[in-house]
Design a protein with these regions (language model features):
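Mixed-charge, low-complexity intrinsically disordered regions
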Residues: 1-26, 36-111
Length: 111
């Protein structure tokens, strides 16, 4: 899978990304059918190779390289499960939208 910033994640697994305002969270697909999917959160750890580049500004500081952040895969938390549904506008659950075939973890340091 090319749509990921999480290192060492299993290649044969299916993923989705939850869009949370400015942040992104990867989820693994546990159960799958055409109208409903059951997802579990992907556990990630900070990648020691990526260091945020902060500059003075904004509320406290501005992270200039946040778009290049990477994370390390640390498993899937199968105790927590959420159910998402296929709608006219794509995959969703309450107020969140989901992107298929994408495992992106993104923390917005500039929010």
């Amino acid at each position: 899978m090319n749509n990921t910033n999480t290192k060492n994640s299993p290649e044969n697994a299916k993923y989705m990304t939850m869009l949370c305002y400015t942040d992104r969270k990867p989820l693994g697909v546990v159960k799958d059918n055409p109208r409903t999917k059951v997802l579990s959160p992907v556990l990630v750890a900070k990648d020691p190779e990526w260091k945020p580049d902060f500059h003075p500004g904004g509320f406290s500081a501005y992270c200039a390289n946040q778009i290049s952040q990477t994370w390390l895969y640390d498993g899937i938390d199968e105790e927590v499960q959420i159910r998402v549904y296929k709608t006219k506008r794509g995959w969703s659950m309450k107020f969140h939208q989901f992107v298929e075939d994408c495992a992106v973890h993104f923390y917005d340091y500039n929010f």
